């Protein structure tokens, strides 16, 4: 059955089930001109938005399934919420689909969205559905809450801070190359690209332990660290050899001849967090969240990032994914 067979309202009826996972905060959900939800006294609201385009951000049957596309469209937004230190609460979405798309495929698309929302306690409040002449376009706007005055910005880094990142970097970019090459194996790299994990828990802990600046690694460490340096008017000194890499990434690079650090610095879509904080606070945070690696320090400066490789240090340019230049 195609979408053209069931129509817009049939489609809405088909997907609106199981969209509310936290009903106590919802006054009006799907079915009216707008959604109404309750806010929490003493909290501020965080809003983010992202778009994924079929053929540009995902290729069905090659780099993603419909389930994975739906999951990732939400995950990228929850990562932005996490990068502010906030707790995600609600989202709305706009989906452009072709009339020829099979209804079972839309079921999978929304199953991916609903599964990740259920995991993080996020309500789908509604949205918009339109016809696309060529490929799907998925736009998600997510909302979160954080204690008033506690949002962690890119602009808070201060000299003396430790620079740290979560988990390992470069897996998603490598996973994309593995998928495009049609390589067997490398399951962890493929999953890192298709179904990234937004670091919501770490974002909340960063607030608890007084993190000074925070950014999610969506475009690559080179880009995100430069954003912190520029916004904070400081310099970041990163140690290349301290950047955490997974064993599977190293194996892929041995086979493919690629540079694992290039994936970490410019690969993008890892959706890990890079943060800066006072050393004492960092070690307290690390006791509660062990998957953190110190990779550098903050010093007084003019907004540059330097990459140290043994005895050699060079300026690290803000290269990474750029939507309008089409790459680095």
Tell where the protein language model's regions lie, with residue ranges.
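Gly/Ser/Thr-rich beta-alpha loop segments that engage phosphate groups in nucleotides
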Residues: 31-33, 87, 128-129, 146, ...
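Short, well-ordered alpha-helical segments in soluble proteins
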Residues: 117, 144-147, 167-173, 180-183, ...
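Glycine-rich phosphate/pyrophosphate-binding loop regions near the starts of catalytic domains
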Residues: 10, 17, 21-165
């Amino acid at each position: 059955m195609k979408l053209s067979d069931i129509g817009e309202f049939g489609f809405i009826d088909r997907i609106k089930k199981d969209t509310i996972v936290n009903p106590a905060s919802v006054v009006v959900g799907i079915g009216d001109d707008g959604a109404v939800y309750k806010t929490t006294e003493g909290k501020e609201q965080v809003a983010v938005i992202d778009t994924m385009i079929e053929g540009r951000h995902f290729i069905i049957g090659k780099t993603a399934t419909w389930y994975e596309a739906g999951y990732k469209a939400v995950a990228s937004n929850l990562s932005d919420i996490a990068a502010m230190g906030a707790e995600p609460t609600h989202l709305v979405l706009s989906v452009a689909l072709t009339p020829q798309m099979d209804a079972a495929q839309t079921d999978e698309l929304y199953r991916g969205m609903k599964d990740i929302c259920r995991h993080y306690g996020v309500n789908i409040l509604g949205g918009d559905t339109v016809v696309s002449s060529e490929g799907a376009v998925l736009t998600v706007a997510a909302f979160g809450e954080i204690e008033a005055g506690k949002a962690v910005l890119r602009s808070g880094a201060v000299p003396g801070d430790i620079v740290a990142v979560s988990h390992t970097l470069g897996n998603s970019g490598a996973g994309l190359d593995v998928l495009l090459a049609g390589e067997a194996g490398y399951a962890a790299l493929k999953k890192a690209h298709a179904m990234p994990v937004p670091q919501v828990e770490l974002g909340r802990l960063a607030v608890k332990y007084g993190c000074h600046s925070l950014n999610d690694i969506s475009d690559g460490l080179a880009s995100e660290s430069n954003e912190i340096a520029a916004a904070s008017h400081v310099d970041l000194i990163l140690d290349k050899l301290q950047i955490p890499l997974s064993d599977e990434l190293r194996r892929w690079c041995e086979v493919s001849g690629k540079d694992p650090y290039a994936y970490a610095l410019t690969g993008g879509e890892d959706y890990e967090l890079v943060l800066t904080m006072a050393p004492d606070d960092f070690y307290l945070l690390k006791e509660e969240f062990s998957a953190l690696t110190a990779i550098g320090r903050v010093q007084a400066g003019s907004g540059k990032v330097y990459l140290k490789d043994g005895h050699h240090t060079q300026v690290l340019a803000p290269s990474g994914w750029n939507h309008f230049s089409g790459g680095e």
